[in-house]
UniProtKB/Swiss-Prot annotation:
Bilayer topology term: Single-pass membrane protein
Cellular compartments annotated: Cytoplasm; Cell membrane; Secreted
Tissues with expression: Expressed broadly at a low level in the early embryo.
Lineage: Eukaryota, Metazoa, Chordata, Craniata, Vertebrata
Organism: Xenopus laevis
Name by which UniProt lists this protein: MyoD family inhibitor domain-containing protein
Length: 246
């Protein structure tokens, strides 16, 4: 059987053929760019996913190791400061201590320098010592004055012995010294007739003694007999001072 072949369609010649070839070349270019962009996006997403997975795995491994094994690594020392910075700070502190304080701008120009005398502390020390001594002396003087005032007030509070009190004391001492003789006189005067001329100078009888000027008076020489012995008088004065304080 004979097959009949169809003749090929004639290709366009001239400018139509050139335009068709250009269109055939330009059409597949956008499709290739899209495929490349898609490949790049897939690669970046895969890389990110892998990095995230590796980070998670590393963290889990570190946590397991920290929980299971003790820490054996020693802590590291902190970095030491520079010696130059330390020297500068020491120089600045030395200047401040010596009494030189300066202010400078950013350009390094000194606005003003304040000179403080270095011997200020040395001068203030003896002044403070003098003030301390003055305060101590004033305190001692005030304490002495307060003591003297207390003593004077105590002496002023004590009542001075009047001459009347001295007479009363003397009478009391004589009565205490001749208490027995006084008792005998009182008893003799009460029982009139028992009294003798030796014990008393007067009695209740008609016969009166030579020393008596009036009948039955108490002038029996008690004061003279008591004051004859000075020791007895001193003892009686002390006893009266104790028993009857003024």
């Amino acid at each position: 059987m004979s097959q009949e072949r169809e003749p090929f369609s004639p290709r366009p010649e001239g400018p139509e053929q050139v335009t068709s070839t250009e269109e055939s070349l330009l059409v597949p270019l956008p499709h290739g760019k899209c495929e490349k962009e898609n490949m790049d996006l897939e690669d970046t997403t895969l890389y990110r996913n892998k990095s995230i997975q590796t980070d998670i795995e590393d963290r889990s491994i570190l946590e397991d190791n920290s929980n299971s094994q003790p820490i054996k690594a020693q802590p590291q020392r902190l970095p030491q400061p520079n010696t130059s910075a330390l020297e500068q700070s020491e120089e600045e502190t030395g200047k401040i201590q010596n009494g030189h304080v300066g202010l400078s701008n950013i350009n390094g120009i000194h606005n003003g320098v304040k000179h403080v005398p270095a011997d200020h502390r040395n001068i203030s020390a003896p002044v403070s010592q003098k003030m301390h001594r003055k305060i101590q002396s004033s305190l001692s003087v005030s304490s002495d004055g307060s003591k003297k005032s207390k003593e004077s007030s105590a002496y002023s509070q004590k009542p001075s012995a009047s001459p009347e009190d001295g007479c009363v004391h003397c009478i009391l001492t004589c009565l205490f010294c001749e208490f027995l003789t006084l008792c005998n006189i009182v008893v003799g005067q009460a029982s009139c007739g028992i009294c003798t001329s030796e014990a008393c100078c007067c009695c209740c009888t008609e016969e009166m003694g030579d020393d008596c000027n009036c009948p039955c008076d108490m002038d029996c020489g008690i004061m003279d007999a008591c004051c004859e012995s000075s020791d007895c008088l001193e003892i009686c004065m002390e006893c009266c001072g104790i028993c009857f304080p003024s």
